[in-house]
């Protein structure tokens, strides 16, 4: 009896302590001046950061982490929220989650013991897409609720779960909230903004999580895949499909064939908890499966990259805004179905309802993790160990193409059934040539090794284990030099390794057999190793050698080359290396003369057309050697001056942008800055003002800049975005007025034409290649067919459809525009523009730079009717007066991923 009283007393004291702690936690209204969810009220990031720090100071349930800088220099924060006892022991629980997540080095028995000891780790973020304002505000409210509530469910969650509340986009919240709250009249407040809500990527910041180009992506990936390895990742978004409140899991097919099945089953389990809670709380409007467009196929999203790391990724897309709105009538959403089990009726809607729904969903996820703590942790280990085992033996992933081959083998077996010797399954799924790879080797002697190092860093920043060769070695009969990288698939994150190197094999996902395709959510294929032009070898047997394991998360630098002794005639370096352009720009910025070698250096058999040459001088040597060492660029010394040479000089580069921002322009800005190209943003009003040649040598128009000509005047492709020169300036601050407007056929195109005729260079991508039709360049849309009645029409989607995929094209390396490029390269292609030349094209000096020479150019993804692409041209150079126009049908700057194509941009950026 006495012991019971003591225990009861301890529990009572603990509850009193928790209650006192909760009373000390500042409420959002005390800090912000309004309740989270109040109409017409948004918090800025400055206010949110201060509140997070107050929670950290006031509550022993909260620990704040500074996870790194944003692109605009703010600090990005994450809160760990759990019971006070767990907070005191966070490092131990982090170690348990890391160890189970990586799976190697422990036995099954040890894993079970760790799962029994550990705490489930759940990541919840908000604000990635800053105009989706529910996300940041549910994060604030969730932090407050977890730090202050003392109900039984909350205390059980805090005892069993470590909740990581991560802000995903500090800069975006500051921009959006400040813009919204600037208007004094609440009823006139709007979330429209003058520029992208992430400095470079805008909405595409949720497409960067296998490349990790952006600082915020790097910060988040480090926490997810190196520091914590949570079991659940919940990524909040907007907006829900019309006629619903929120879309969430389970998601529609297809899912990637490399996932562990426990990922998908675990996703279904969490999804059931989410839907169940909303329905039990009489909150209708949750849609799932085919009720929304979302799938689990794509890698690169904050949520989806988690699947490739054995993490259950949750996405919800919810309606709501600080400005009151409504749920409109969508009749076919009113009938209950498995996709929409509890429909919602049309009604008015306010911000508070969205916050309430979000809190319910968060608690559903956390309650699931709390109740299944042991299984969440052990399954993380089991999935990782499954990957280790699959990568350590012969294994055949069941890809759609392999199943198609199996069906063909069955048909062959039936036609020769009398032999009785056919075993189609064994023929396909035990074929040694079809085995999954066990090892990828990235040799250090490839032409552009610094770009290969960038690729390796993308792997490392996603938690992949990489080895480096400390000396020369041999594998599968081939010699490799020291410094080569070895990536084995016998590791927990094997799905991500395969996805970065191997083609994506998207199924023929049709509405019905022979019917139109169902568009993938985002891309169908993206293989980064292909897009970046990486040379690698794929081995189906394990490799041992003089290898050193790179510590998790330790990014690599290109090896500093050995610099030659002083040279009498100067120095050369390769045009095949992307980083060479960084070196060139460093030299030019210091006033040092740089030349290109149209025929290479005849005294160097390894030299190629377009290589760079710098004359000898003390200053040139100092700048060149410093920059080359920083960027991993090899330098050759010359004893005799090369000939012929062509001098290049810095150009005045203009990059089109618009009010509200352009993601394609933003990514191009990112690339220019990464490679030290100075530039100026140019907006439509400046173009319309004319006299462009006075200020600029080169103008870049990415997709969305140039409108299509009037219907019937050309074969223009793509919608463009333009044609309306004016725009209402009401509500737009004066400092942004110069950004307003659009490119028009009447005002803008004549000025661009004049710029070209006076010797300017224009580079266009995707829909902006419409400019060619405005200028009467003799090209046509190649993606048309002639019917029996002689009528020319576009292909239907059942005949031809290539969503985002990787296709191989030939490159005309004889042209200056393609100096440094290989004879073939991989393009990211998304129903992109494809051309054919008119009769007079050659006589007018129009040249093809890239084209499809085969009827099967698909390398990764999905391509219905790809045979129609044969002989289609996707990159063109055309003279216009004294200037040059470049047309790139695909986006060769796409999300700063296709490093293998960057030279097609860089070569044009000098005068």
What are these regions (language model features)?
Residues 18-22:
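Sec/Tat signal peptide C-region and signal peptidase I cleavage site
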Residues 171-174, 194-198, 212-227:
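Substrate-binding cleft of carbohydrate-active enzyme catalytic domains
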Residues 23-133, 137-161, 207-208, 213-215, ...:
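Intrinsic-disorder/low-complexity accessory segments
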Residues 8-17:
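Bacterial N-terminal signal peptides
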Residues 165-169, 180, 235-243, 768:
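Short, solvent-exposed turn/loop segments enriched in Gly/Ser/Thr/Pro and often Arg
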Residues 158-163, 168-207:
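Divalent-metal coordination cores built from histidine and acidic residues
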């Amino acid at each position: 009896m006495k012991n019971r009283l003591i225990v009861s007393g301890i529990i009572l004291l603990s509850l009193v302590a928790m209650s006192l702690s909760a009373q000390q936690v500042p409420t959002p209204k005390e800090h912000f001046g309004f309740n989270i969810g109040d109409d017409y009220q948004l918090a800025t990031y400055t206010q949110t950061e201060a509140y997070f720090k107050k929670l950290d100071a006031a509550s022993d349930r909260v620990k704040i982490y500074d996870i790194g800088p944003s692109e605009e220099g703010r600090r990005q924060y994450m809160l760990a929220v759990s019971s006070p006892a767990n907070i005191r022991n966070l490092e131990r629980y982090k170690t348990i989650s890391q160890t189970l997540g990586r799976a190697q080095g422990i036995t099954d028995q040890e894993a079970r013991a760790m799962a029994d000891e550990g705490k489930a780790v759940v990541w919840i973020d908000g604000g990635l897409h800053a105009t989706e304002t529910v996300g940041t505000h549910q994060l604030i409210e969730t932090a407050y609720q977890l730090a202050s509530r003392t109900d039984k469910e909350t205390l059980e969650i805090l005892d069993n779960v470590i909740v990581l509340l991560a802000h995903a986009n500090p800069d975006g919240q500051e921009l959006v909230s400040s813009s919204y709250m600037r208007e004094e009249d609440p009823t006139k407040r709007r979330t429209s903004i003058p520029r992208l809500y992430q400095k470079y990527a805008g909405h595409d910041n949720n497409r960067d999580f296998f490349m990790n180009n952006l600082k915020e992506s790097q910060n988040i990936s480090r926490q997810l895949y190196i520091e914590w390895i949570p079991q659940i990742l919940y990524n909040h978004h907007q907006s829900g499909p019309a006629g619903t409140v929120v879309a969430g899991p389970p998601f529609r097919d297809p899912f990637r064939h490399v996932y562990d099945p426990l990922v998908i089953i675990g996703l279904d389990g969490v999804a059931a908890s989410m839907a169940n809670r909303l329905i039990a709380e009489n909150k209708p409007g949750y849609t799932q499966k085919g009720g929304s467009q979302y799938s689990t196929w794509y890698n690169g999203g904050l949520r989806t990259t988690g699947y490739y790391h054995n993490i259950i990724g949750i996405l919800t897309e919810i309606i709501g805004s600080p400005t009151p709105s409504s749920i409109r009538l969508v009749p076919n959403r009113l009938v209950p179905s498995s996709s929409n089990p509890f429909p919602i009726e049309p009604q008015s809607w306010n911000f508070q309802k969205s916050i309430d729904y979000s809190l319910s969903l968060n608690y559903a996820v956390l309650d699931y993790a709390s109740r299944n703590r042991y299984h969440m942790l052990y399954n993380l280990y089991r999935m990782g160990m499954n990957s280790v085992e699959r990568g350590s033996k012969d294994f055949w992933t069941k890809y759609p193409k392999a199943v198609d081959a199996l069906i063909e083998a069955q048909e062959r077996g039936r036609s020769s059934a009398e032999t009785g010797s056919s075993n189609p399954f064994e023929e396909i799924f035990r074929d040694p040539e079809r085995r999954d790879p066990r090892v990828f080797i990235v040799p250090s002697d490839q032409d552009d090794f610094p770009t290969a190092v960038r690729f390796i860093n993308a792997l490392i920043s996603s938690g992949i284990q990489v080895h480096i060769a400390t000396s020369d070695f041999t594998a599968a009969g081939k010699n490799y030099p020291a410094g080569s990288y070895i990536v084995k698939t016998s590791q927990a994150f094997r799905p991500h390794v395969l996805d970065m190197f191997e083609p994506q094999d998207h199924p023929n996902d049709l509405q019905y057999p022979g019917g139109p395709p169902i568009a993938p959510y985002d891309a169908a294929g993206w293989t980064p190793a292909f897009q970046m032009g990486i040379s690698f070898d794929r081995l189906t047997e394990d490799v041992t050698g003089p290898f050193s394991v790179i510590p998790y998360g330790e990014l690599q630098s290109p090896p500093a080359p050995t610099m030659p002794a002083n040279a009498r005639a100067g120095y050369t370096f390769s045009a095949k290396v992307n980083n060479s352009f960084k070196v060139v720009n460093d030299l030019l910025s210091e006033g040092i003369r740089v030349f290109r070698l149209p025929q290479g250096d005849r005294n160097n058999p390894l030299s190629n057309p377009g290589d760079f040459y710098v004359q000898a001088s003390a200053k040139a040597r100092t700048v060149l050697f410093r920059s080359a060492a920083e960027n991993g660029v090899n330098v050759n010394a010359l004893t005799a001056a090369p000939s012929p040479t062509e001098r290049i000089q810095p150009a005045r580069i203009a990059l089109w942008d618009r009010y509200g921002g352009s993601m394609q322009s933003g990514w191009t800005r990112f690339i220019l800055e990464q490679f030290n190209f100075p530039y100026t943003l140019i907006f439509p009003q400046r173009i319309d003002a004319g006299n462009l040649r006075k200020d600029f040598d080169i103008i870049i128009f990415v997709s969305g800049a140039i409108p299509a000509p009037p219907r019937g005047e050309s074969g223009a492709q793509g919608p463009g975005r333009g044609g309306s020169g004016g725009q209402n300036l009401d509500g737009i601050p004066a400092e942004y007025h110069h950004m307003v407007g659009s490119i028009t056929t009447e005002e803008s195109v004549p000025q661009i034409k004049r710029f070209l005729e006076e010797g300017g260079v224009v580079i266009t991508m995707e829909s902006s290649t419409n400019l060619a039709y405005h200028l009467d360049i003799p090209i046509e849309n190649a993606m048309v067919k002639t019917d029996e009645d002689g009528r020319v029409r576009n292909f239907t989607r059942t005949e031809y459809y290539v969503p985002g995929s990787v296709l191989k094209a030939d490159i005309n390396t004889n042209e200056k525009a393609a100096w440094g490029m290989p004879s073939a390269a991989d393009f990211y292609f998304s129903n992109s523009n494809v051309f054919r030349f008119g009769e007079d094209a050659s006589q007018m000096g129009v040249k093809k730079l890239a084209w499809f020479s085969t009827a099967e150019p698909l390398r990764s993804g999905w391509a219905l009717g790809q045979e129609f692409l044969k002989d289609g041209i996707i990159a063109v150079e055309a003279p216009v007066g004294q200037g040059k126009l470049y047309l790139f049908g695909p986006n060769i700057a796409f999300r700063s991923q296709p490093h293998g194509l960057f030279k097609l941009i860089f070569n044009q950026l000098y005068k």
